[in-house]
Amino acid sequence: MTSRPALRRYAVIGNPITHSRSPQIHAMFAAQTGISLEYERIPAPLDGFRATAEAFFLAGGQGLNVTVPFKQEAFELAREHLSARARMAGAVNTLTWRDGVLQGCNTDGVGLVNDLIRLGVMLQGARLLLVGAGGAARGVLQPLAEAGCAEIRIVNRSPGRAAELLAAWTASGIPGGVQTSAGALDEAGGAWDIVINATASSLHDLAPALPGGLYAPGALAYDMVYGARPTPFMRQARADGAALTADGLGMLVGQAAESFFIWHGLRPDPTAVLTTLRANLLAED
């Protein structure tokens, strides 16, 4: 009698974690690609990320998705073997145990760029306004620039934080040809092709205090937060003249697809997964 090979073990780790849709997403990716795997949610104490993650890998785990509030701690855990994107982001959302080495990557920016492409947005030559200067904003700057944006302006409620983020990005090496600037929310300017809300304002049923006149003809407003209904930022953008609005559900699926590729070497199709998740959100509303 032959024994079956052990299932490859993966998980998402965070606090809180019960809301995470990652197990469902990776199960659908696995079904698409014919891969057998086990994927679970792992809650970690706020002061116990390292111990929990190390125990998972010592028990044979092969990959972890990392969510709030542990992305910076994951960066430190994998500091010796970080991808260029993770170094720029200062955060890791994908940990991989491979050949006796713990590797760290950040797939958030790739997930965002791929979702913008799915939406039909022209990134080459685009003028982009990024609202927010926290970890979510930092994680997407480099991929957006590499995708061809001509101008990126960072604005934040605390303009000093926007300036600090721009300085850190400049020090790490901004791709040539990208015009950059930073300022306060009321210094956002106008005629932007893409406006991305990288703050958590919509989670609190609020929109950033942005001035009017932000949007160029045909512009997209994109909120990294997602839900069954349009977010406060999306509603604000529509009222201000944005031609298109989108939430961050596609970014969630896109970053998961990139993690799946890192782990398995196969690219799943996110479209069907996104359709299923959107239907689930509507049913839960």
UniProtKB/Swiss-Prot annotation:
Keywords: Amino-acid biosynthesis, Aromatic amino acid biosynthesis, NADP, Oxidoreductase. Pathway: Metabolic intermediate biosynthesis; chorismate biosynthesis; chorismate from D-erythrose 4-phosphate and phosphoenolpyruvate: step 4/7. Shikimate binds at S20, R21, S22, T67, N93, D108, Y226. The keyword NADP applies. InterPro entries: Aminoacid_DH-like_N_sf, NAD(P)-bd_dom_sf, SDH_C, Shikimate_DH, Shikimate_DH-bd_N, Shikimate_DH_fam, Shikm_DH/Glu-tRNA_Rdtase. GO terms for biological process: amino acid biosynthetic process; aromatic amino acid family biosynthetic process; chorismate biosynthetic process; shikimate metabolic process. It catalyses: shikimate + NADP(+) = 3-dehydroshikimate + NADPH + H(+). It comes from the Bacteria. One of its GO terms (cellular component) is cytosol. The keyword NADP applies. One of its GO terms (molecular function) is NADP binding. The active site is at K71 (proton acceptor). NADP(+) binds at G132, A133, G134, G135, A136, M224, G248. Belongs to the shikimate dehydrogenase family. HAMAP family: Shikimate_DH_AroE. Homodimer. This is Shikimate dehydrogenase (NADP(+)). It comes from Bordetella avium (strain 197N). The lineage of its organism: Bacteria, Pseudomonadati, Pseudomonadota, Betaproteobacteria, Burkholderiales. The gene is aroE.
